[in-house]
């Protein structure tokens, strides 16, 4: 819907897909975006410091990178340079070669496993986790939206998110705390200070899910 509106009025549309790439199928043609960026370190399980940028062909021709080195363009004479004609004109000569190779392997791994299978598994497990959390007294699952993914967020009426995180860490369970820096208006509107964030992936088992829920029950009892 956003892509259709943006395209109708000629508004450039950049989509941050960091949380989507690697856990579900993403099609830039269906989305209608002009640009799409994503990181390698999240659901793709690639190295930190890696990522990629998609640029629609007509925008490649219209834009010039803010910084140009000998990779993005060829210097023809002392006053003239010739930019590359593909999206690699936005890259730099110096690069993280080891990370780039590992990132490529992470992408191959996900593609070999199959993104539809990955999405089905992640969404199924995340739904189970939400159901289990909703059964715990004084605990609220805070996820919204028509399509709920593998990122599960919740809060407790009396225990703050930071305390829950530290107590779970003592029990060798890793979660994170979201304080709303990326969704400040939504948090303010809903009266939320912070939430606990538990991310599910396809390699998580039902036994691990139940172990997590049992520790939450013990913690808030």
Label each PLM-derived region with a short phrase.
Residues 1-221:
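Pyridoxal 5′-phosphate
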């Amino acid at each position: 819907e956003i892509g259709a509106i943006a395209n109708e009025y000629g508004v450039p549309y950049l989509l941050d897909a960091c949380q989507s790439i690697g856990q579900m199928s993403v099609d830039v043609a269906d989305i209608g975006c002009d640009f799409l960026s994503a990181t390698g370190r999240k659901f793709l399980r690639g190295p930190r410091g890696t990522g990629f940028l998609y640029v629609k062909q007509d925008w490649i021709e219209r834009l010039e990178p803010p910084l140009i080195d000998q990779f993005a363009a060829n210097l023809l004479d002392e006053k003239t340079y010739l930019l590359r004609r593909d999206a690699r004109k936005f890259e730099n000569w110096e690069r993280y070669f080891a990370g780039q190779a590992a990132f490529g392997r992470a992408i191959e791994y996900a593609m070999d496993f199959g993104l539809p299978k990955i999405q089905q598994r992640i969404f199924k497990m995340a739904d189970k986790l939400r159901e289990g959390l909703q059964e715990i007294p004084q605990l609220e699952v805070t996820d919204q939206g028509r399509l709920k993914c593998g990122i599960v967020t919740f809060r407790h009426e009396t225990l703050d998110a930071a305390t829950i995180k530290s107590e779970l860490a003592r029990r060798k369970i890793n979660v994170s705390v979201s304080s709303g820096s990326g969704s400040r208006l939504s948090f303010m509107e809903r009266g939320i200070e912070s939430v606990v964030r538990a991310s599910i992936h396809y390699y998580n088992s039902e036994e691990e899910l139940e172990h997590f829920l049992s520790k939450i029950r013990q913690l808030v009892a």
